Regions:
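Surface-exposed peri-terminal alpha-helical interaction modules
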Residues: 2-185
Length: 185
């Protein structure tokens, strides 16, 4: 299924970037909401995120992904502009999977929470090894936001979306432990 999604994502992206009017009309008529079902149990509008990802504005999409996760977590998270690790478990699985699929489809399977989680599992759940593998840290030095991150497809697998590590690993650990992934394992 993932290989099919990657191929579909690549095809859609190539058509999306083609300036030909007939192709754009075809996309509008047949795929007005893109190729990823924008499922949300809380009626979150993922179309702006989908557009940024289709345009491969990965930095803008990263910021918007956090905003959407804050919306899912509630008013307090929206106001403080970040999420407590304890709020992650209550994020709806359908929404987390939608966010992940949007990233997967727009990056040829290179980016997304599920990609990061697979890498984390492959390194024995060792966050230190994960940070190096996805280029969030080099030796003892954290990658500086935003200038040192790679905001295009030349980034290593799992590089995006970002998760703020200033408060430790608890947020990303909670994302990786979320029940949404048990449906995909």
């Amino acid at each position: 299924e993932q290989a099919e999604n990657v191929a579909l994502g690549k095809a859609y992206h190539a058509l999306y970037l083609n300036p030909n009017l007939k192709i754009q009309e075809f996309l509008q008529q047949n795929f007005p909401l893109g190729v990823v079902p924008l499922e949300s149990t809380q009626e979150i509008d993922y179309r702006p995120l989908q557009q940024l990802l289709a345009q491969q504005d990965f930095q803008g999409a990263d910021v918007l992904t956090l905003q959407k996760m804050c919306e899912l977590a509630g008013t307090a998270a929206v106001e403080r502009k970040w999420i407590y690790f304890t709020e992650i478990v209550n994020l709806p699985s359908a929404d987390l999977i939608t966010l992940d699929r949007l990233w997967l489809m727009s990056s040829a399977g290179k980016f997304g929470f599920s990609v990061q989680r697979r890498i984390w599992l492959s390194v024995g759940k060792d966050f230190t090894k994960l940070w190096t593998k996805i280029n969030w840290k080099s030796g003892n030095v954290w990658t500086r936001y935003p200038q040192e991150f790679t905001w295009d497809l030349s980034a290593p697998k799992g590089h995006l979306p970002l998760s703020n590590q200033l408060r430790g690993v608890r947020v990303i650990d909670a994302i990786f432990a979320h029940p949404a992934w048990s449906k995909q394992d």
